[in-house]
Structure formats: C-alpha cells, structure tokens
Amino acid sequence: MSAQILDGKAIALELRDSIQKEVEAQVANGKKPPGLAVILVGEDPASQVYVKNKKIACEKAGFNDVSMVLPAETSQAELLAKIDELNTRDDVHGIIVQLPVPDHIDPEEIIERIDPKKDVDGFHPYNMGRLATRLPELAPCTPHGVMTMLAKTGIPLRGLNAVVVGASNIVGVPMALELLNERATVTVCHSATKDLPQKVAEADLVVVGVGIPNMVKGDWIKDGAIVIDVGINRLDDGSLCGDVEYDVAKEKASWITPVPGGVGPMTIATLLQNTLQAAYGVKA
C-alpha cells in the first residue's frame, strides 16, 4: 500500500484564492485592506526567508504589508514600544513577531504585549485559552492549518486515537487542543515520554513537530494511519526532509503529508485567514 498525499500546497492555494476574493469584495465596499505587520529582529537567514514568503503572500492576497526589520541589538523596551504603536494603528489588523528573537529579548513578554485581537499567530495566552475552552478566535496557524487540510480532504477525526509528538506552544499543545475539540482521543508525547515507538504504533493519526530529521521511523507507523509531518529540516547535502522517515512511512500510511509542500503552505494560508478575520470578522 502506498499512501495518498495530503497536498497542502493545492489546498492552501484554494484558500488563498478565497481570501483574495473576500478582500476584493470588502475593499469594493469601502473597507481598508487587511494590514499585516511582521516584525523581524536581526538577520537570521531562515527567518528572513519566512518573512519574505509572508510578504509575497500578503501582496498576492491584496493585503497591506507593514513588515519591518529591526536591528539585532534592538532592546526589549524598543520592541515593546513598536508593538504598542502597531496596536493603536487602525490600518494594522494583525501583528506577528518572527521567532526566534535574539537571546536578550523575552519572547513571552513580547507575545503578551500584542493586542489579542491582532495576535494573528494565535500565541497570546488569551487566544490559547480560547482554544483550550473550545471558544477559538485566532488559533495558532500551523495546527489550525493542519485541521483545515484534514477537513478539506474529508478525513473524519471523531474517535481516532491521535498521537502528537512534540509539546511546544507553537505546534504540539495547540495541535492537541484542536484534535480534542474534534473529539479525537489525544496523547501528547515529549522528551520524557517512555516507549515512543509503541505510542506511535498505536496511533490512527500521528502529528510530528520536533525539528529532528527523520526522528519518527517509518516502521513505527501503524498500517493505514494518517501521518502529518510538521517538521522541515535542511540536511548537510542541502536537501529538505521532515521529522518522519517519509519513504518507509508512505508505504504504511493511508494519508501522508510531503515535505516540502504539506503543512508549510497551510501555515501561511492560515496566517492570511487569521488576518482577514481580525480585519473583517469573517473567514474565507
């Protein structure tokens, strides 16, 4: 058996097209285009690529791009002041600070300073709390993008045994909450989990986001399982791979996300969707 591919790239393009049409309709009715401020502190090469991709996506969707690059030596106080300014601007509907930030910056304080109604990354404790109480507003982009991809593909989640490998606030924890809200039975695995291969082998659905190349071996995967690989890692030869051993896993799974072209495009599309919602109170 060879798995069917969960084509995040195609689903994301469909979603972005709907977002663009909604923006055109709102602007035609006299509304301002959605404004997204992406703040990059320093010159981390990977972050520069992510910010560039977000900028291109904004422009294609008809958004007002308010991206800015601040020097690496920017102080905590200076960054907080910039966020305060953006919080008050009525042409800015979404604010994100590209992570990671330099070591002298406290990311938790920065995230909490963003107006929760403009927190389109969904990382503010207010938005995480809304998700945890089944009242989501702006949900973290990667997990919500995964949920959109599964829904658009018609994969039912109710009653499935789901294993989330990784417990970060960016992916693992909100992913578990999203799955729980769809009535899956969820196990979260992390660095202290015992017998990870056995946990994975019992899963109908596996979501992996740890940032370690090929950490989850293909032969751990249960026959017919759904595999969502959130990881994207660059190897020494320049090639990209996920956190799951893809070539082996795809022979056992029923559905699997490729890397690249799986979860990544859905993350950016969901960021646009969150910004649209913050601007107009509607979803595409």
Curated annotation (Swiss-Prot):
It catalyses: (6R)-5,10-methylene-5,6,7,8-tetrahydrofolate + NADP(+) = (6R)-5,10-methenyltetrahydrofolate + NADPH; (6R)-5,10-methenyltetrahydrofolate + H2O = (6R)-10-formyltetrahydrofolate + H(+). InterPro entries: Aminoacid_DH-like_N_sf, NAD(P)-bd_dom_sf, THF_DH/CycHdrlase, THF_DH/CycHdrlase_cat_dom, THF_DH/CycHdrlase_CS, THF_DH/CycHdrlase_NAD-bd_dom. One of its GO terms (cellular component) is cytosol. Pfam families: THF_DHG_CYH (PF00763), THF_DHG_CYH_C (PF02882). Its EC number is 1.5.1.5, 3.5.4.9. One of its GO terms (biological process) is purine nucleotide biosynthetic process. NADP(+) binds at residues 166-168, 191, 232. Keywords: Amino-acid biosynthesis, Histidine biosynthesis, Hydrolase, Methionine biosynthesis, Multifunctional enzyme, NADP, One-carbon metabolism, Oxidoreductase, Purine biosynthesis. Pathway: One-carbon metabolism; tetrahydrofolate interconversion. The keyword Oxidoreductase applies. One of its GO terms (molecular function) is methenyltetrahydrofolate cyclohydrolase activity. The keyword Magnesium does not apply. HAMAP family: THF_DHG_CYH. Homodimer. Belongs to the tetrahydrofolate dehydrogenase/cyclohydrolase family. PANTHER family: C-1-TETRAHYDROFOLATE SYNTHASE, CYTOPLASMIC, C-1-TETRAHYDROFOLATE SYNTHASE, CYTOPLASMIC-RELATED. Catalyzes the oxidation of 5,10-methylenetetrahydrofolate to 5,10-methenyltetrahydrofolate and then the hydrolysis of 5,10-methenyltetrahydrofolate to 10-formyltetrahydrofolate. This is Bifunctional protein FolD 1. It comes from Hydrogenovibrio crunogenus (strain DSM 25203 / XCL-2).
